[in-house]
């Protein structure tokens, strides 16, 4: 049922397949490949597989650089496509208006043919992908004032504290709220908050000096 492939024929076929295409530049190899042609027709990433993407008509620079790009690629096989584009852009700027005029006329002719062939064509540039937003929340400022409510005997009492004192006052608040205390616990919590704030200020001499300078004189 299956034919036997001779080992010498198989070896010759493999060697012929692996022979590089000498004399052809990287630019010609790129444009001759079917994937590159499909990439050009679909706009760069091959997404429009269902319907062909209509290419834009060439402008004057593209008409001029069509032949010059091939010439530069043949003279410099190792040069990358981006470097060739930079060199062609520099050469195009050095041309005079009289030298550029024939290419402008050719570009206008191609644009007129394009309008006749695709009367409903509209250029739709691809939108750049937006960067993903980070889910991390920004840290709050150290001087921001946070407001909480204290539940005491089924009544809510507003309780305000600053970030510098929250680490010391908040655990004590939870301890007191977990046990059943009379209604005047809110006053004791406020006193404890003032005590912890003054303790934290006493630990740092610089902060204490700033605090004393901010107090009004008696």
UniProtKB/Swiss-Prot annotation:
Name of the protein this chain belongs to: Sex-determining region Y protein
Record's function text: Transcriptional regulator that controls a genetic switch in male development. It is necessary and sufficient for initiating male sex determination by directing the development of supporting cell precursors (pre-Sertoli cells) as Sertoli rather than granulosa cells. Involved in different aspects of gene regulation including promoter activation or repression. Binds to the DNA consensus sequence 5'-[AT]AACAA[AT]-3'. SRY HMG box recognizes DNA by partial intercalation in the minor groove and promotes DNA bending. Also involved in pre-mRNA splicing.
Subcellular location: Nucleus speckle; Cytoplasm; Nucleus
Organism: Mirounga leonina (Southern elephant seal)
GO BP terms: cell differentiation; male sex determination; sex differentiation
GO cellular component: cytoplasm; nuclear speck; nucleus
DNA-binding region listed in the record: 54-122
Region annotation Disordered: where it falls in the sequence: 33-53
